[in-house]
């Protein structure tokens, strides 16, 4: 949430001009917390700040700065204001997003919305004059500090794109969590793994940030089962570094299906009586508006079906509360997350931009998700679906996608089982990792300047040459896949 602020005075809206309701001043409460920032292609660092802030009160209001203010004071945004607001509102710990919030945090703004305290990370942020962005709320004794999430920032993610690095990849998440894999000595690896597992547990909490929420699993299976090659002859020894390996052979002699083994990392609330278990999967790389809108539409589809069955009647709600002590939604959405190797196998270059741990945290913080399965297969097999921890899902949702240059359909099995459901195209259909990278590359000069201002190395000619070569190889692979070469 780092950002700079113009020193000019911020206008205090009159009644009727506030960006979102309420228009009348709200009574200030210590249980109502304010955070603010850019939240540009929101990552788990943003979510971590919101989680810690939410733990300090009962409501969390999140100010989101305008595109124009960010451009003037920090540099170009990757995501539009509406996309950034969507990301904030999808976070399970956010109560409400406040768009166009001022850069230098304003006492009249936080007071209007009834927030006693402003929360921010322990990093320093300043305006264009070098003054503290939180000077007014600090002077008023209305500022609280939380620990900044280490190892992740928007600047870091942009750097991965511009420099085309792969050093962030994780070979085996479970080995990383146990300390058996990763940089450093044994004690350092163990300490790092324990910290990572604790962060997963933290992000798996419910909307209060204090109680169990999401279930978290890891699926053990062989490498071919996760990649789901259709033949054993796909493995080659002479593949070029960075190029995507495509399934271009016939479907004879298929890889044997594996049910694998599910290991629970975090126990959450689990499936409640009457809930429909539905499954979604993907890379969830640079978790953004395209992913969020898809998950929202899945939730909406399930709620529409449940409404027709009387789920939302007062009598049904009362029965659920009497039985479990709380009300809950009609669908239990399980999100499968592919390993880094699986994504890079199919997309090439240096995808995924976020590693499996980072992508998992981004998925866990989303209020539409109730369980996460790390290490899910690229192509769904009958063995996998029939042995899910919650039994076979009643539906598998996916968007309208052209899986070229694949020679098979990764969703053939759920279609054969008649549980496949397709979400129609929507406004944010094309917003994914590739689109975000394209936005970055289109405005490369501006982003490089932003990086230099933050003390980061810009992308040089050699890095650009590497990216162009990797993209050329990827295009060649796609052509070969289309014609079965």
Where do the language-model regions lie?
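Nucleotidyltransferase catalytic core that binds NTPs
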Residues: 1-485
């Amino acid at each position: 949430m780092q950002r700079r602020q113009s020193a000019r005075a911020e206008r205090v809206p009159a009644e009727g001009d506030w960006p979102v309701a309420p228009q009348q001043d709200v009574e200030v409460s210590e249980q109502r917390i304010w955070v603010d920032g850019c939240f540009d292609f929101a990552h788990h660092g943003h979510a971590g700040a919101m989680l810690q802030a939410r733990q300090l009160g009962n409501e969390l209001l999140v100010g989101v700065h305008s595109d124009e203010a960010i451009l003037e004071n920090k540099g170009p945004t990757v995501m539009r204001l509406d996309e950034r607001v969507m990301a904030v509102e999808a976070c399970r710990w956010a109560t409400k997003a406040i768009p166009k919030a001022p850069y230098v945090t304003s006492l009249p703004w936080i007071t209007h919305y009834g927030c006693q305290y402003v929360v921010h990370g322990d990093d320093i942020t300043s305006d264009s004059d070098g003054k503290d962005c939180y000077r007014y709320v600090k002077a008023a004794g209305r500022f609280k500090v939380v620990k900044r999430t280490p190892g992740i920032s928007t600047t870091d993610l942009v750097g991965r794109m511009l420099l085309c690095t792969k050093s962030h990849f994780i070979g085996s998440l479970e080995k990383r969590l146990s300390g058996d894999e990763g940089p450093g000595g044994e004690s350092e690896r163990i300490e790092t793994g324990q910290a990572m597992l604790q962060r997963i547990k933290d992000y798996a909490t419910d909307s209060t940030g204090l109680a169990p929420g999401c279930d978290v699993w890891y699926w053990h299976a062989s490498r071919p089962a996760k990649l789901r090659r259709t033949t054993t002859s796909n493995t080659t020894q002479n593949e070029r570094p960075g190029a995507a390996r495509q399934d271009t052979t016939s479907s004879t002699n298929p890889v044997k299906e594996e049910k694998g083994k599910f290991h629970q990392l975090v126990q959450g609330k689990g499936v409640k009586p009457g809930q429909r278990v539905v499954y979604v999967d993907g890379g969830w790389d640079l978790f953004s508006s395209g992913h969020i809108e898809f998950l929202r539409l899945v939730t909406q589809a399930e709620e529409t079906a449940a409404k027709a069955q009387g789920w939302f009647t007062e009598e049904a709600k009362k029965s659920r509360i009497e039985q479990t002590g709380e009300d809950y939604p009609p669908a239990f959405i399980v999100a499968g997350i592919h390993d880094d190797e699986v994504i890079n196998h199919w997309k090439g270059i240096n995808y995924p931009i976020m590693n499996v741990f980072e992508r998992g945290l981004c998925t866990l913080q989303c209020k539409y998700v109730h369980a996460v399965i790390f290490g899910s297969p690229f192509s769904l097999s009958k063995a996998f679906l029939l042995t899910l921890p919650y039994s076979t899902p009643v539906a598998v949702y996916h968007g309208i996608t052209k899986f070229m240059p694949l020679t098979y359909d990764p969703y053939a099995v759920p279609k054969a089982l008649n549980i496949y459901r397709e979400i129609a195209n929507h406004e944010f259909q094309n917003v994914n990792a590739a689109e975000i990278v394209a936005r970055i590359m289109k405005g490369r000069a501006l982003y490089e300047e932003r990086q230099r201002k933050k003390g980061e190395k810009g992308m040089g000619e050699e890095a650009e040459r590497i990216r162009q070569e990797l993209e050329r190889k990827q295009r060649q692979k796609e052509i070969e896949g289309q014609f079965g070469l």
